[in-house]
């Protein structure tokens, strides 16, 4: 894989959906809890799969999980799980579907405790600011960080599923808490 493809971080390749995601979302700071919940759902679903697989099913996940409304997802029942096991728009993994419902309940508890999931996430960053890395090569980008290690450890302790340090790091990248756009990427100097 090339470090830079068409001026972008090489991981997004030339797939139009992937490039659009890279250009318009990945690494942009997200402060909205609904969007943070969306990324949490999608990143958790990605465990063991490629991100493009989940990205292509994003609209299916949106329909399946109440437009990513955590309060509604938290109310889902075993009947909803059975229904979603037959829904073509998502990866049909019972454990991941059930964990999404559990994670929604825990997400709401964190909002109550910290005022927002955004505030909770910032609590793992010593100066409460996003990290902007200056990597020149994809091989320099780590799969985890002290922040993702601490956050995933705390989330696991709270009962979250499918959210280990690597998934947490991907979540932090996606939502702009860690900016890993390569220094030569076209998105590098854009306003976040």
Question: Where in this protein do the model-derived segments appear?
Answer:
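HhH-family (HhH-GPD) DNA N-glycosylase catalytic core used in base-excision repair
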Residues: 1-192
């Amino acid at each position: 894989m090339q470090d830079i493809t068409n001026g972008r971080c090489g991981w997004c390749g030339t797939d139009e959906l992937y490039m659009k995601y890279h250009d318009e979302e990945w690494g942009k700071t997200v402060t909205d809890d609904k969007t943070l919940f969306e990324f949490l759902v999608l990143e958790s679903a990605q465990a063991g799969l490629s991100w493009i697989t989940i990205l292509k099913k994003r609209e299916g996940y949106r329909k399946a999980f109440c437009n990513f409304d955590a309060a509604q997802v938290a109310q889902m029942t075993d009947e909803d799980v059975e229904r979603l096991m037959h829904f073509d728009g998502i990866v049909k993994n019972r454990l991941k579907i059930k964990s999404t419902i559990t994670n929604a309940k825990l997400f709401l508890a964190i909002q109550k405790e910290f005022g927002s999931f955004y505030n909770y996430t910032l609590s793992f960053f010593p100066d409460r600011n996003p990290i902007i890395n200056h990597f020149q090569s994809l091989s320099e980008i780590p799969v985890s960080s002290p922040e993702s290690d601490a956050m995933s450890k705390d989330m696991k302790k709270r009962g979250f599923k499918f959210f280990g340090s690597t998934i947490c790091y991907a979540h932090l990248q996606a939502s702009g808490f860690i900016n890993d756009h390569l220094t030569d990427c076209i998105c590098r100097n854009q306003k976040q």
